[in-house]
From Swiss-Prot:
InterPro entries: RNaseH-like_sf (IPR012337), RNaseH_sf (IPR036397), X-over_junc_endoDNase_Mg_BS (IPR020563), X-over_junc_endoDNase_RuvC (IPR002176)
Designated name of the protein: Crossover junction endodeoxyribonuclease RuvC
One function term, GO molecular function aspect: crossover junction DNA endonuclease activity
Reaction catalyzed: Endonucleolytic cleavage at a junction such as a reciprocal single-stranded crossover between two homologous DNA duplexes (Holliday junction)
Enzyme class, spelled out: hydrolase
Pfam (any one): RuvC
Compartment(s) where it occurs, according to its Swiss-Prot or TrEMBL record: Cytoplasm
Self-association state and partner proteins as the record states: Homodimer which binds Holliday junction (HJ) DNA. The HJ becomes 2-fold symmetrical on binding to RuvC with unstacked arms; it has a different conformation from HJ DNA in complex with RuvA. In the full resolvosome a probable DNA-RuvA(4)-RuvB(12)-RuvC(2) complex forms which resolves the HJ.
The species this protein was found in: Synechococcus elongatus (strain ATCC 33912 / PCC 7942 / FACHB-805) (Anacystis nidulans R2)
GO cellular component, one term: Holliday junction resolvase complex
Length: 161
């Protein structure tokens, strides 16, 4: 049957998601079940934006019914943006806890290493690896969704290792 893995790329404005049906071994074929974004309006109050993420993630989990979740680990770049991402990430982690879903966390460098063999690979190389692994006609868009699919792939690769 395989395992359903949901990848989540946290953000306050946009949470990317990608859901895979992964075979039990490398012999089977991967299936991209769904991908997209949860978005929040820029002008809304922070509490309203976080509530949107909370509610929409619960709905997404009901739809996808994942067995496991892969979440991008927070890294620091611009302090203001980091705080907003941390708040959104906290909501994601709360929902995963409430739903009793096992999760793993990966840094962007770990995802790049897993998919391209190079921890400093450019974003396009990672996106092309996603397209190749899933035998897609095009790279998933937007970038946040492609990143989330890459997280789910990384989780599957780690399980096979």
């Amino acid at each position: 049957m395989g395992q359903r893995i949901l990848g989540l790329d946290p953000g306050l404005a946009i949470v990317g998601f990608g859901a895979l049906l992964c075979p039990d071994s490398r012999q089977g074929s991967l299936e991209l079940l769904d991908f997209g974004v949860i978005s929040t309006p820029a002008g809304a109050e922070i509490g309203d934006r976080l509530e949107t993420i909370y509610q929409d993630l619960h709905q997404l989990i009901d739809l996808v019914q994942p067995d496991a979740v892969a979440v991008e680990k927070l890294f620091f770049y611009r302090m203001g943006n980091t705080i907003a991402v941390a708040q959104a990430r906290g909501v994601l982690m709360l929902v995963l806890r409430q739903r009793r879903l096992p999760y793993c966390e990966f840094t962007p460098a770990q995802v790049k290493q897993a998919l391209t063999g190079y921890g400093n690979a450019p974003k396009l190389a990672v996106q092309q690896a996603v397209q190749r692994e899933l035998q897609l006609d095009a790279i998933p868009r937007p970038d946040d969704a492609a990143d989330a699919v890459a997280l789910a792939l990384t989780a599957w690769f780690q399980q096979l290792a």
